[in-house]
Amino acid sequence: MARYTGPVCKLCRREGIKLFLKGDRCYTDKCAIARRNYAPGQHGHTRKKPTEYALQLREKQKAKRIYGVLEAQFRRYFEMAERQPGITGENLLVILERRLDNVVYRLGLAESRAQARQLVRHNFFTVNGRKVNIPSYLVKVGDVIALKEEKKDSPIAKEIMERAASKTLPAWLSYDANNAVGKVEALPKREDIDIPVEEHLIVELYSR
């Protein structure tokens, strides 16, 4: 299955909730779901009571779209979460939060996860001093994520450094604005993860 390349605002309208896929635009009146709060397509205005399966599927689709993950990889993350001690749904969200593209976004070094994914692929960052250009790389406690020195003079780097300096960080990350360096201080807890997903429904879906 190929990665979705169509209008991302349609994805928010499909889920009936803001997924914050376009960065700052999602916080303005230009957000599509603020203007057209119904599903896209000919039958978008039709409201039917969803089945239990439909509710479970929608939660999975929301999580996949928020983090930009395709089905095969999402399934692997779920299997990883199942093998770990604790609550499977929470384990799954923690794994998704540990993706390098998500951490770059959480640090404020990208406007959206999609932009973070692109910047990682274009070698803008190092992890513990080593080049990492794999968006799905899973960070660990103690990992240091830094903007490459040779990239700091580029217009986009200056823009993201300015944005990151005023970003409110989750409790599990720290950021040195003077050097554009972030650190994973701890693994996130469920209360640190502010995404509109009911993860227990995803667990129920994969347990069918």
From Swiss-Prot:
> Which GO terms of the molecular function aspect are on file?
rRNA binding; structural constituent of ribosome
* Superkingdom of source: Bacteria
Q: Which GO terms describe its cellular component?
A: small ribosomal subunit
Pfam families the record matches = Ribosomal_S4 (PF00163), S4 (PF01479)
Stored InterPro entries: Ribosomal_uS4 (IPR022801), Ribosomal_uS4_bac-type (IPR005709), Ribosomal_uS4_CS (IPR018079), Ribosomal_uS4_N (IPR001912), S4_RNA-bd (IPR002942), S4_RNA-bd_sf (IPR036986)
Share an example GO biological-process annotation for this protein.
translation
Q: Which residues form the S4 RNA-binding domain?
A: 98-161
CDD domains, per the entry: S4
Question: Keywords for this entry?
Answer: Ribonucleoprotein, Ribosomal protein, RNA-binding, rRNA-binding
Q: Per its database record, what is this protein's job?
A: One of the primary rRNA binding proteins, it binds directly to 16S rRNA where it nucleates assembly of the body of the 30S subunit.
NCBIfam families given in the database record: PRK05327.1, rpsD_bact
User: How does this chain assemble?
Assistant: Part of the 30S ribosomal subunit. Contacts protein S5. The interaction surface between S4 and S5 is involved in control of translational fidelity.
Q: Which family does it belong to?
A: Belongs to the universal ribosomal protein uS4 family.
Name it.
Small ribosomal subunit protein uS4
